[in-house]
Amino acid sequence: MSNLDARIAELAAKYLPLASEMLKEAIRIPADYVDKPIDQGGDPACGTSNHEFPRIDYLRKKIVAIKAVRKDEDAYFDAFGNLVWRVEDPTDGIPSDQKKVIYIDGHTDTVKPLRAQWLQNTGGIDCFDGIIDATKVNKDFLNKELGYLPPESEWNHLIFGRGSADQLGGVISAAIATKIMLELEAEGALKGVIVYSYATVCEEDNDGAGPMYLNRDVFPTAAPAVVPDVVILTDSSGCSKNGALGIYRGQRGRMQIEVTVKGKSCHGSMPWEGKNPLEFGGAIVKEAADKYDQRIGFKDDKFLGHGTRTASWARLDTPSDCAVPEKFTFRFDRRLTIGETPEQSCADVEALDAVAVARKAGLTVEISIPTYTDASWKGYVLNNPQVYLGWVTPEEHPAVQAAVAAYKKVISPNVDGKVGTGGVLTKEPRVDRWVFSTDGVGYPIPKDASVPGAARKQWVNNGVYKHPAMIGFGTGIEQNTHKIGECLDERELQHSAAFLARFPSIYAGNA
Protein backbone atom coordinates (compact mmCIF):
# COMPACT_ATOMS: atom_id res chain seq x y z
CA MET A 1 0.00 0.00 0.00
CA SER A 2 1.46 3.35 -1.07
CA ASN A 3 1.34 6.41 1.14
CA LEU A 4 -1.48 7.87 -0.97
CA ASP A 5 -3.47 4.65 -0.63
CA ALA A 6 -2.99 4.67 3.13
CA ARG A 7 -3.91 8.35 3.47
CA ILE A 8 -7.07 7.95 1.40
CA ALA A 9 -8.19 4.94 3.43
CA GLU A 10 -7.38 6.80 6.65
CA LEU A 11 -9.39 9.89 5.71
CA ALA A 12 -12.31 7.81 4.42
CA ALA A 13 -12.51 6.16 7.84
CA LYS A 14 -12.13 9.51 9.61
CA TYR A 15 -15.01 11.06 7.66
CA LEU A 16 -17.43 8.13 8.01
CA PRO A 17 -19.37 9.90 10.81
CA LEU A 18 -19.70 12.96 8.56
CA ALA A 19 -20.89 10.81 5.65
CA SER A 20 -23.48 9.09 7.86
CA GLU A 21 -24.73 12.44 9.16
CA MET A 22 -25.08 13.81 5.62
CA LEU A 23 -26.90 10.73 4.38
CA LYS A 24 -29.38 10.76 7.25
CA GLU A 25 -30.16 14.43 6.63
CA ALA A 26 -30.50 13.96 2.86
CA ILE A 27 -33.02 11.19 3.54
CA ARG A 28 -34.87 13.23 6.19
CA ILE A 29 -35.31 16.54 4.37
CA PRO A 30 -38.62 15.75 2.58
CA ALA A 31 -40.25 15.35 6.01
CA ASP A 32 -40.11 19.15 6.32
CA TYR A 33 -42.22 19.58 3.18
CA VAL A 34 -44.56 16.65 2.53
CA ASP A 35 -47.11 17.59 5.20
CA LYS A 36 -46.75 21.38 4.97
CA PRO A 37 -49.51 23.27 3.09
CA ILE A 38 -48.49 24.09 -0.46
CA ASP A 39 -49.23 27.79 0.05
CA GLN A 40 -46.67 27.73 2.87
CA GLY A 41 -43.95 26.15 0.77
CA GLY A 42 -44.95 22.53 1.19
CA ASP A 43 -44.64 19.86 -1.48
CA PRO A 44 -46.29 16.44 -1.01
CA ALA A 45 -43.95 14.98 -3.65
CA CYS A 46 -40.74 16.40 -2.18
CA GLY A 47 -37.74 14.20 -2.84
CA THR A 48 -39.20 12.38 -5.83
CA SER A 49 -38.46 13.06 -9.49
CA ASN A 50 -38.69 16.76 -10.41
CA HIS A 51 -39.16 17.66 -6.73
CA GLU A 52 -35.55 17.38 -5.57
CA PHE A 53 -34.65 21.01 -4.86
CA PRO A 54 -34.74 21.08 -1.02
CA ARG A 55 -32.48 18.03 -0.92
CA ILE A 56 -29.95 19.19 -3.48
CA ASP A 57 -29.96 22.72 -2.08
CA TYR A 58 -28.89 21.20 1.24
CA LEU A 59 -26.26 19.12 -0.53
CA ARG A 60 -24.79 22.10 -2.38
CA LYS A 61 -24.47 24.14 0.80
CA LYS A 62 -23.02 21.19 2.70
CA ILE A 63 -20.50 20.40 -0.04
CA VAL A 64 -19.23 23.98 0.19
CA ALA A 65 -19.25 23.94 4.00
CA ILE A 66 -17.19 20.74 4.34
CA LYS A 67 -14.70 21.97 1.71
CA ALA A 68 -15.50 19.30 -0.85
CA VAL A 69 -14.87 22.07 -3.41
CA ARG A 70 -12.15 24.70 -3.54
CA LYS A 71 -14.55 27.65 -3.69
CA ASP A 72 -18.28 28.31 -3.54
CA GLU A 73 -18.77 28.79 -7.28
CA ASP A 74 -17.36 25.31 -7.96
CA ALA A 75 -20.69 23.85 -6.79
CA TYR A 76 -23.70 24.94 -8.83
CA PHE A 77 -26.95 23.92 -10.53
CA ASP A 78 -26.99 23.48 -14.29
CA ALA A 79 -29.89 24.47 -16.56
CA PHE A 80 -31.58 21.09 -16.16
CA GLY A 81 -31.39 21.17 -12.38
CA ASN A 82 -28.51 18.78 -11.73
CA LEU A 83 -26.17 19.70 -8.88
CA VAL A 84 -22.61 19.85 -10.21
CA TRP A 85 -19.34 20.26 -8.36
CA ARG A 86 -15.85 20.33 -9.81
CA VAL A 87 -12.36 19.76 -8.42
CA GLU A 88 -8.97 20.09 -10.11
CA ASP A 89 -5.37 20.75 -9.10
CA PRO A 90 -4.50 23.96 -11.01
CA THR A 91 -0.86 23.71 -9.92
CA ASP A 92 -0.04 20.26 -11.28
CA GLY A 93 1.56 21.72 -14.43
CA ILE A 94 -0.69 19.82 -16.83
CA PRO A 95 -2.88 21.81 -19.27
CA SER A 96 -6.59 21.27 -18.64
CA ASP A 97 -7.23 20.00 -22.16
CA GLN A 98 -4.69 17.23 -21.60
CA LYS A 99 -6.13 15.99 -18.33
CA LYS A 100 -8.35 12.96 -17.82
CA VAL A 101 -11.92 14.04 -17.12
CA ILE A 102 -13.75 11.83 -14.63
CA TYR A 103 -17.48 12.13 -14.00
CA ILE A 104 -19.00 10.77 -10.79
CA ASP A 105 -22.74 10.40 -11.36
CA GLY A 106 -25.46 9.71 -8.80
CA HIS A 107 -29.15 10.57 -8.75
CA THR A 108 -30.83 12.46 -5.91
CA ASP A 109 -34.49 11.60 -6.47
CA THR A 110 -36.27 8.59 -5.01
CA VAL A 111 -39.35 6.56 -5.77
CA LYS A 112 -42.51 7.39 -3.82
CA PRO A 113 -41.80 7.05 -0.10
CA LEU A 114 -45.06 5.28 0.92
CA ARG A 115 -44.71 6.66 4.44
CA ALA A 116 -47.84 5.06 5.89
CA GLN A 117 -46.82 1.63 4.62
CA TRP A 118 -43.39 1.97 6.21
CA LEU A 119 -44.83 2.59 9.65
CA GLN A 120 -47.50 -0.07 9.22
CA ASN A 121 -45.08 -2.80 8.12
CA THR A 122 -41.86 -1.99 9.96
CA GLY A 123 -43.47 -1.00 13.24
CA GLY A 124 -40.88 1.54 14.32
CA ILE A 125 -39.17 2.90 11.20
CA ASP A 126 -40.15 6.07 9.35
CA CYS A 127 -39.21 6.45 5.69
CA PHE A 128 -37.62 9.86 6.38
CA ASP A 129 -36.63 9.82 10.05
CA GLY A 130 -35.32 6.27 10.18
CA ILE A 131 -35.74 4.27 13.39
CA ILE A 132 -38.14 6.16 15.66
CA ASP A 133 -38.87 3.33 18.11
CA ALA A 134 -36.40 0.44 18.17
CA THR A 135 -38.64 -1.58 20.49
CA LYS A 136 -41.38 -1.74 17.84
CA VAL A 137 -39.24 -2.65 14.81
CA ASN A 138 -40.67 -5.71 13.06
CA LYS A 139 -37.49 -7.67 12.45
CA ASP A 140 -39.30 -10.61 10.88
CA PHE A 141 -40.77 -8.31 8.23
CA LEU A 142 -37.38 -6.78 7.43
CA ASN A 143 -35.71 -10.16 7.10
CA LYS A 144 -38.43 -11.37 4.73
CA GLU A 145 -38.71 -8.14 2.74
CA LEU A 146 -35.09 -7.24 2.11
CA GLY A 147 -32.57 -9.06 -0.04
CA TYR A 148 -29.79 -8.88 2.52
CA LEU A 149 -29.25 -7.72 6.08
CA PRO A 150 -26.08 -8.16 8.13
CA PRO A 151 -26.21 -10.21 11.35
CA GLU A 152 -28.49 -8.58 13.91
CA SER A 153 -25.49 -7.77 16.09
CA GLU A 154 -24.38 -5.35 13.34
CA TRP A 155 -27.70 -3.58 12.78
CA ASN A 156 -26.32 -0.54 14.59
CA HIS A 157 -24.53 0.19 11.30
CA LEU A 158 -27.78 0.35 9.30
CA ILE A 159 -29.26 3.63 8.07
CA PHE A 160 -32.94 3.21 7.19
CA GLY A 161 -35.03 5.39 4.92
CA ARG A 162 -36.23 6.00 1.39
CA GLY A 163 -33.16 6.70 -0.73
CA SER A 164 -30.67 5.03 1.60
CA ALA A 165 -29.89 2.14 -0.77
CA ASP A 166 -31.08 3.85 -3.94
CA GLN A 167 -29.02 5.88 -4.06
CA LEU A 168 -28.22 8.84 -1.91
CA GLY A 169 -25.26 7.01 -0.39
CA GLY A 170 -23.47 7.22 -3.72
CA VAL A 171 -23.94 10.99 -3.85
CA ILE A 172 -22.67 11.41 -0.30
CA SER A 173 -19.67 9.19 -1.07
CA ALA A 174 -18.79 11.46 -3.99
CA ALA A 175 -18.86 14.51 -1.73
CA ILE A 176 -16.56 12.87 0.80
CA ALA A 177 -14.29 11.68 -2.03
CA THR A 178 -13.80 15.16 -3.49
CA LYS A 179 -13.10 16.48 0.01
CA ILE A 180 -10.41 13.81 0.41
CA MET A 181 -8.93 14.51 -3.04
CA LEU A 182 -8.58 18.20 -2.25
CA GLU A 183 -6.97 17.48 1.10
CA LEU A 184 -4.49 15.10 -0.57
CA GLU A 185 -3.86 17.31 -3.58
CA ALA A 186 -0.19 17.76 -2.63
CA GLU A 187 0.21 13.98 -2.59
CA GLY A 188 -1.06 13.59 -6.15
CA ALA A 189 -4.71 12.68 -5.62
CA LEU A 190 -5.77 15.15 -8.33
CA LYS A 191 -2.70 15.13 -10.55
CA GLY A 192 -3.66 15.10 -14.21
CA VAL A 193 -7.41 14.90 -13.65
CA ILE A 194 -10.54 17.02 -13.55
CA VAL A 195 -13.37 15.52 -11.54
CA TYR A 196 -16.97 16.56 -12.13
CA SER A 197 -19.53 15.17 -9.71
CA TYR A 198 -23.12 15.18 -10.91
CA ALA A 199 -25.96 14.78 -8.43
CA THR A 200 -28.64 14.29 -11.05
CA VAL A 201 -32.39 14.71 -10.98
CA CYS A 202 -35.37 12.87 -12.46
CA GLU A 203 -33.61 9.49 -12.80
CA GLU A 204 -36.38 7.42 -11.24
CA ASP A 205 -39.05 8.73 -13.61
CA ASN A 206 -36.85 9.13 -16.67
CA ASP A 207 -33.61 7.13 -16.44
CA GLY A 208 -30.59 9.06 -17.64
CA ALA A 209 -32.39 12.40 -17.83
CA GLY A 210 -29.42 14.32 -16.42
CA PRO A 211 -26.94 12.87 -18.93
CA MET A 212 -29.46 13.31 -21.77
CA TYR A 213 -29.40 17.03 -21.03
CA LEU A 214 -25.59 17.00 -21.23
CA ASN A 215 -25.67 15.21 -24.58
CA ARG A 216 -28.15 17.71 -25.99
CA ASP A 217 -26.96 21.03 -24.60
CA VAL A 218 -23.42 20.67 -23.27
CA PHE A 219 -21.23 18.11 -25.03
CA PRO A 220 -21.74 19.18 -28.68
CA THR A 221 -19.95 22.50 -28.11
CA ALA A 222 -17.95 21.70 -24.98
CA ALA A 223 -14.21 22.02 -24.55
CA PRO A 224 -12.37 18.69 -24.18
CA ALA A 225 -11.80 19.54 -20.52
CA VAL A 226 -15.56 19.17 -19.96
CA VAL A 227 -16.18 15.95 -21.90
CA PRO A 228 -15.75 12.81 -19.76
CA ASP A 229 -13.15 10.12 -20.36
CA VAL A 230 -14.86 7.93 -17.78
CA VAL A 231 -18.17 8.02 -15.92
CA ILE A 232 -18.48 6.32 -12.54
CA LEU A 233 -22.13 5.56 -11.85
CA THR A 234 -22.72 5.39 -8.11
CA ASP A 235 -26.06 3.60 -8.20
CA SER A 236 -26.36 0.58 -5.92
CA SER A 237 -23.86 -2.07 -7.04
CA GLY A 238 -24.21 -4.51 -4.17
CA CYS A 239 -25.63 -8.01 -4.59
CA SER A 240 -27.49 -9.84 -1.83
CA LYS A 241 -25.72 -13.10 -2.70
CA ASN A 242 -22.30 -12.09 -4.00
CA GLY A 243 -21.22 -9.02 -2.08
CA ALA A 244 -21.43 -5.26 -1.61
CA LEU A 245 -19.71 -2.62 -3.77
CA GLY A 246 -19.35 -4.53 -7.00
CA ILE A 247 -17.58 -3.01 -10.00
CA TYR A 248 -20.26 -3.05 -12.69
CA ARG A 249 -19.52 -2.62 -16.37
CA GLY A 250 -22.88 -2.87 -18.09
CA GLN A 251 -26.65 -3.04 -17.98
CA ARG A 252 -29.56 -3.89 -20.23
CA GLY A 253 -31.52 -1.11 -21.86
CA ARG A 254 -35.21 -0.56 -21.28
CA MET A 255 -38.24 1.01 -22.89
CA GLN A 256 -41.91 1.63 -22.28
CA ILE A 257 -44.46 0.25 -24.75
CA GLU A 258 -47.90 1.80 -24.42
CA VAL A 259 -51.00 -0.02 -25.63
CA THR A 260 -54.30 1.85 -25.89
CA VAL A 261 -57.44 -0.20 -26.44
CA LYS A 262 -60.51 1.86 -27.34
CA GLY A 263 -63.90 0.20 -27.14
CA LYS A 264 -67.50 1.27 -26.79
CA SER A 265 -69.00 2.12 -23.43
CA CYS A 266 -72.48 1.11 -22.35
CA HIS A 267 -74.47 0.19 -19.26
CA GLY A 268 -73.08 -2.80 -17.41
CA SER A 269 -76.49 -4.49 -17.43
CA MET A 270 -76.37 -4.71 -21.23
CA PRO A 271 -72.73 -5.55 -22.09
CA TRP A 272 -73.72 -6.72 -25.58
CA GLU A 273 -74.36 -3.07 -26.43
CA GLY A 274 -70.68 -2.22 -25.97
CA LYS A 275 -67.17 -3.40 -26.77
CA ASN A 276 -65.15 -3.98 -23.62
CA PRO A 277 -61.56 -2.71 -23.91
CA LEU A 278 -60.66 -4.06 -20.47
CA GLU A 279 -61.50 -7.63 -21.40
CA PHE A 280 -59.82 -7.48 -24.81
CA GLY A 281 -56.86 -5.60 -23.33
CA GLY A 282 -56.59 -8.16 -20.56
CA ALA A 283 -56.28 -10.85 -23.21
CA ILE A 284 -53.37 -8.92 -24.76
CA VAL A 285 -51.63 -8.73 -21.37
CA LYS A 286 -52.20 -12.45 -20.78
CA GLU A 287 -50.83 -13.49 -24.18
CA ALA A 288 -47.82 -11.20 -23.78
CA ALA A 289 -47.07 -12.77 -20.39
CA ASP A 290 -47.39 -16.28 -21.81
CA LYS A 291 -45.05 -15.45 -24.69
CA TYR A 292 -42.50 -14.07 -22.25
CA ASP A 293 -42.75 -17.13 -20.01
CA GLN A 294 -41.91 -19.23 -23.08
CA ARG A 295 -39.18 -16.73 -24.11
CA ILE A 296 -40.76 -16.36 -27.54
CA GLY A 297 -39.21 -13.30 -29.21
CA PHE A 298 -36.57 -12.66 -26.53
CA LYS A 299 -32.81 -12.83 -26.93
CA ASP A 300 -30.27 -13.84 -24.33
CA ASP A 301 -26.75 -12.60 -23.66
CA LYS A 302 -24.13 -14.40 -21.62
CA PHE A 303 -23.14 -11.25 -19.73
CA LEU A 304 -26.23 -9.03 -19.57
CA GLY A 305 -28.85 -11.77 -19.40
CA HIS A 306 -32.08 -12.13 -21.36
CA GLY A 307 -34.57 -9.49 -22.38
CA THR A 308 -37.78 -9.23 -20.36
CA ARG A 309 -41.29 -7.84 -20.67
CA THR A 310 -43.86 -7.27 -17.97
CA ALA A 311 -47.08 -5.26 -17.64
CA SER A 312 -46.19 -2.34 -15.39
CA TRP A 313 -48.90 0.36 -15.43
CA ALA A 314 -52.56 0.79 -16.40
CA ARG A 315 -55.35 3.37 -16.56
CA LEU A 316 -59.02 2.67 -17.16
CA ASP A 317 -61.38 5.31 -18.57
CA THR A 318 -64.90 4.33 -17.56
CA PRO A 319 -68.06 6.25 -16.67
CA SER A 320 -68.63 4.11 -13.57
CA ASP A 321 -68.01 0.73 -12.01
CA CYS A 322 -71.32 -0.48 -13.41
CA ALA A 323 -70.47 0.23 -17.04
CA VAL A 324 -68.46 -1.21 -19.89
CA PRO A 325 -65.36 1.01 -20.01
CA GLU A 326 -64.55 3.32 -22.90
CA LYS A 327 -60.76 2.94 -22.98
CA PHE A 328 -58.03 0.83 -21.39
CA THR A 329 -54.42 2.02 -21.53
CA PHE A 330 -51.52 -0.02 -20.20
CA ARG A 331 -47.77 -0.24 -20.53
CA PHE A 332 -45.15 -2.91 -20.80
CA ASP A 333 -41.77 -2.44 -19.17
CA ARG A 334 -39.42 -4.01 -21.73
CA ARG A 335 -35.79 -4.69 -20.80
CA LEU A 336 -33.54 -4.92 -23.85
CA THR A 337 -30.49 -7.12 -24.03
CA ILE A 338 -27.84 -7.15 -26.74
CA GLY A 339 -29.39 -7.76 -30.17
CA GLU A 340 -32.86 -6.50 -29.24
CA THR A 341 -34.25 -3.23 -30.61
CA PRO A 342 -37.15 -0.94 -29.68
CA GLU A 343 -38.59 -1.34 -33.17
CA GLN A 344 -38.73 -5.13 -32.97
CA SER A 345 -40.05 -5.03 -29.41
CA CYS A 346 -43.02 -2.91 -30.55
CA ALA A 347 -43.53 -5.17 -33.56
CA ASP A 348 -43.69 -8.20 -31.26
CA VAL A 349 -46.60 -6.65 -29.37
CA GLU A 350 -48.26 -5.65 -32.63
CA ALA A 351 -48.05 -9.29 -33.77
CA LEU A 352 -49.87 -10.75 -30.76
CA ASP A 353 -52.95 -12.73 -31.75
CA ALA A 354 -55.02 -10.96 -29.10
CA VAL A 355 -54.36 -7.63 -30.81
CA ALA A 356 -55.76 -8.96 -34.08
CA VAL A 357 -58.77 -10.43 -32.26
CA ALA A 358 -59.57 -7.09 -30.62
CA ARG A 359 -59.36 -5.24 -33.91
CA LYS A 360 -61.51 -7.83 -35.66
CA ALA A 361 -64.14 -7.33 -32.95
CA GLY A 362 -64.27 -3.62 -33.77
CA LEU A 363 -62.01 -2.17 -31.11
CA THR A 364 -59.10 0.16 -31.85
CA VAL A 365 -55.66 -0.93 -30.63
CA GLU A 366 -52.80 1.58 -30.73
CA ILE A 367 -49.22 0.61 -29.85
CA SER A 368 -46.67 3.36 -29.24
CA ILE A 369 -43.62 4.50 -27.32
CA PRO A 370 -44.66 7.21 -24.83
CA THR A 371 -42.83 10.51 -24.51
CA TYR A 372 -41.62 11.87 -21.18
CA THR A 373 -43.08 15.38 -20.95
CA ASP A 374 -42.70 16.38 -17.28
CA ALA A 375 -40.52 19.39 -16.47
CA SER A 376 -37.54 19.22 -14.13
CA TRP A 377 -37.60 21.36 -10.99
CA LYS A 378 -35.83 24.01 -13.10
CA GLY A 379 -38.56 23.88 -15.74
CA TYR A 380 -36.55 22.04 -18.40
CA VAL A 381 -38.59 19.60 -20.53
CA LEU A 382 -36.64 16.90 -22.38
CA ASN A 383 -39.60 15.50 -24.37
CA ASN A 384 -37.67 12.29 -24.95
CA PRO A 385 -39.17 9.01 -26.11
CA GLN A 386 -39.07 6.54 -23.24
CA VAL A 387 -36.33 4.39 -24.72
CA TYR A 388 -33.21 3.94 -22.62
CA LEU A 389 -30.19 2.34 -24.25
CA GLY A 390 -28.16 -0.41 -22.65
CA TRP A 391 -24.38 -0.30 -22.57
CA VAL A 392 -21.32 -2.44 -21.91
CA THR A 393 -17.76 -1.35 -21.15
CA PRO A 394 -15.34 -4.12 -22.18
CA GLU A 395 -13.58 -5.80 -19.28
CA GLU A 396 -10.20 -5.04 -20.83
CA HIS A 397 -10.90 -1.28 -21.01
CA PRO A 398 -8.45 0.76 -18.90
CA ALA A 399 -11.37 2.13 -16.86
CA VAL A 400 -12.34 -1.34 -15.64
CA GLN A 401 -8.73 -2.24 -14.94
CA ALA A 402 -8.22 1.02 -13.02
CA ALA A 403 -11.35 0.27 -10.98
CA VAL A 404 -10.03 -3.16 -10.02
CA ALA A 405 -6.68 -1.61 -9.08
CA ALA A 406 -8.33 1.10 -6.96
CA TYR A 407 -10.38 -1.51 -5.11
CA LYS A 408 -7.31 -3.60 -4.35
CA LYS A 409 -5.37 -0.58 -3.11
CA VAL A 410 -7.84 1.08 -0.74
CA ILE A 411 -10.55 -1.49 0.05
CA SER A 412 -9.04 -4.99 -0.04
CA PRO A 413 -6.53 -4.32 2.78
CA ASN A 414 -9.37 -3.19 5.06
CA VAL A 415 -12.07 -5.87 4.60
CA ASP A 416 -12.09 -9.66 4.68
CA GLY A 417 -15.43 -10.88 3.29
CA LYS A 418 -15.67 -13.55 0.61
CA VAL A 419 -17.56 -13.28 -2.69
CA GLY A 420 -20.70 -15.42 -2.61
CA THR A 421 -21.37 -15.16 1.13
CA GLY A 422 -24.11 -12.53 1.10
CA GLY A 423 -24.04 -8.76 0.76
CA VAL A 424 -20.78 -8.34 2.63
CA LEU A 425 -17.75 -6.21 1.81
CA THR A 426 -15.46 -8.59 -0.07
CA LYS A 427 -11.68 -8.67 -0.11
CA GLU A 428 -11.55 -9.53 -3.79
CA PRO A 429 -13.06 -7.05 -6.28
CA ARG A 430 -16.13 -8.38 -8.05
CA VAL A 431 -16.70 -7.32 -11.67
CA ASP A 432 -20.30 -7.83 -12.78
CA ARG A 433 -23.31 -6.03 -14.25
CA TRP A 434 -26.56 -4.44 -13.10
CA VAL A 435 -29.96 -6.08 -13.29
CA PHE A 436 -31.78 -2.75 -13.08
CA SER A 437 -31.33 0.51 -14.97
CA THR A 438 -29.17 3.54 -14.12
CA ASP A 439 -28.24 7.01 -15.33
CA GLY A 440 -25.83 5.23 -17.68
CA VAL A 441 -28.62 4.91 -20.26
CA GLY A 442 -28.44 8.67 -20.84
CA TYR A 443 -24.85 8.73 -22.08
CA PRO A 444 -24.92 6.73 -25.37
CA ILE A 445 -25.22 8.85 -28.51
CA PRO A 446 -25.29 7.97 -32.23
CA LYS A 447 -21.93 6.73 -33.43
CA ASP A 448 -21.61 9.54 -35.98
CA ALA A 449 -22.46 12.34 -33.50
CA SER A 450 -19.68 14.84 -32.95
CA VAL A 451 -18.29 15.25 -29.43
CA PRO A 452 -15.05 17.22 -28.96
CA GLY A 453 -12.19 14.92 -28.02
CA ALA A 454 -14.27 11.73 -27.79
CA ALA A 455 -11.93 9.78 -30.08
CA ARG A 456 -8.84 10.29 -27.93
CA LYS A 457 -10.83 9.73 -24.74
CA GLN A 458 -11.28 6.03 -25.56
CA TRP A 459 -15.05 6.15 -25.77
CA VAL A 460 -16.70 2.78 -26.30
CA ASN A 461 -18.44 1.92 -29.57
CA ASN A 462 -21.46 -0.36 -29.08
CA GLY A 463 -23.03 -1.07 -32.46
CA VAL A 464 -24.44 2.17 -33.83
CA TYR A 465 -23.90 4.06 -30.58
CA LYS A 466 -20.91 5.31 -28.61
CA HIS A 467 -20.48 6.42 -25.03
CA PRO A 468 -17.77 7.28 -22.53
CA ALA A 469 -16.35 4.30 -20.69
CA MET A 470 -18.71 3.67 -17.78
CA ILE A 471 -18.30 1.68 -14.61
CA GLY A 472 -20.66 1.26 -11.71
CA PHE A 473 -19.61 1.45 -8.10
CA GLY A 474 -22.12 2.43 -5.47
CA THR A 475 -23.36 1.83 -1.96
CA GLY A 476 -26.46 -0.24 -1.37
CA ILE A 477 -27.68 -3.74 -2.16
CA GLU A 478 -29.57 -3.86 -5.46
CA GLN A 479 -32.16 -6.28 -4.02
CA ASN A 480 -32.94 -3.83 -1.17
CA THR A 481 -33.88 -0.92 -3.43
CA HIS A 482 -37.43 0.41 -3.81
CA LYS A 483 -38.59 -1.71 -0.87
CA ILE A 484 -40.32 -0.92 2.40
CA GLY A 485 -37.53 -0.96 4.98
CA GLU A 486 -34.83 0.08 2.49
CA CYS A 487 -31.54 0.54 4.30
CA LEU A 488 -27.79 0.92 3.89
CA ASP A 489 -24.87 -0.40 5.89
CA GLU A 490 -22.99 2.82 6.66
CA ARG A 491 -19.65 1.02 6.45
CA GLU A 492 -20.07 0.97 2.69
CA LEU A 493 -19.88 4.78 2.68
CA GLN A 494 -16.32 4.67 3.96
CA HIS A 495 -15.05 2.26 1.33
CA SER A 496 -17.04 3.81 -1.50
CA ALA A 497 -15.55 7.23 -0.73
CA ALA A 498 -12.06 5.72 -0.63
CA PHE A 499 -12.55 4.08 -4.03
CA LEU A 500 -13.91 7.25 -5.63
CA ALA A 501 -11.03 9.28 -4.20
CA ARG A 502 -8.40 6.86 -5.54
CA PHE A 503 -9.75 5.96 -8.98
CA PRO A 504 -9.04 9.28 -10.79
CA SER A 505 -5.31 9.36 -10.07
CA ILE A 506 -4.92 5.70 -11.05
CA TYR A 507 -6.73 6.27 -14.33
CA ALA A 508 -4.48 9.25 -15.00
CA GLY A 509 -1.46 6.98 -14.60
CA ASN A 510 -0.49 7.95 -11.07
CA ALA A 511 -0.54 4.44 -9.60
Regions found by a protein language model. Name each.
Residues 2-162, 183-193:
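Acidic/His- and Gly-rich active-site-bordering loop/insert found
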Residues 2-7, 11-14, 53-54, 237-241, ...:
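Metal-dependent amide/peptide-bond hydrolase catalytic core
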Residues 95, 139-152, 177-196, 221-225, ...:
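Phosphate-handling active-site elements
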Residues 99, 228-230, 468:
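Conserved acidic residues
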Residues 103-104, 196-200, 231-232, 424, ...:
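Extended hydrophobic secondary-structure segments that form protein cores and membrane-embedded regions
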Residues 105-107, 199, 232-235, 262, ...:
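Short beta-strand segments
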Residues 117-121, 175, 211-214, 245-249, ...:
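Short, glycine/charged-enriched secondary-structure capping and boundary segments
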Residues 152-250:
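Acidic/histidine-rich catalytic neighborhood of metal-dependent amide-processing enzymes
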